[in-house]
Amino acid sequence: MAKKVQWIVVTDLDASLLDESYSYEAASETLEALQAKDIPVVWNSSKTLDEMIEMTKDWQWKRKPILVGENGATLAFPCDPEGDNVTEAVWSDYLRADAVIDGYLCLFDTEVRADILRTIHMLKQKNEFAFRGFSDFTDEALVELTGLSDTAVQLAKARQATEPILWEGSDVDYNAFIQIIKGYGFKALRGGQFTHIMHSKYDKSIGMASVVSLFAKRYPDFSWKTIALGDSPNDAVMLEQADFAVVIPNKAKGTMALKRKDYILADDYASEGWNDSVLKFLKSTQQCI
């Protein structure tokens, strides 16, 4: 007998679920429908777990989002029961947390960031590369550099598996640096202001797959499938691997294309496009109330 299909919504945050003011209000209709049908929502972001956990404090619904942080390198699951039956199994029965932060069971490799810092500082000294990492800046300098508040800087600095660096050298040296770190098992994701150094074994699709694996372990009677949404090249690997993919157009950067041909392009930007696309998907799969 075939297992019943259950969907998981996996989404990027900035310029996808969140609008320019970092609000998901325009997606409330669909988020309400997802809650009513017990369809899990997973935030898959470059943000730290601490940043996202702070954001969940304004979450309006009972079922909290599951969190994938630092581009797939960290995970967090709510440690309280998700249903009304307090005797049901909880996530702590299926995973071993490395930390518990504000009601979330957090999973990450406790050694990887130290390994990254040790390696890049060695390479910087040996090759005279010109860059500074988050760990090199004072809090005051990061506030001035990023425009974040003191509190936001503290949350952004709470990294478990990556190190953002500000490259201050030539493009030639940058390309050489990228090639060298590959030999140590690391890679670089270049963002608008910072380049994120992380382990090569992680990306957003790996984080998504880890979540699906744990759902299959906890709820083995269902066939778990994913709908993924994102707006930037950093999301592409996640969208390529999802069962159903939605590309959100980006006002500033344009619209990315995927290798797969069966993806959906949202009709609007950010949370409005997110809301309409997921709602249409739910209706097409008869998942909507």
Each model region followed by its residue ranges:
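Mg2+-dependent phosphoryl-transfer enzymes with acidic/Ser/Thr/Gly-rich catalytic loops
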Residues: 2-5, 24, 195-289
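Conserved acidic, metal-coordinating active-site core of Asp-based
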Residues: 119, 123-227
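Active-site phosphate-binding/coordination module
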Residues: 25-133
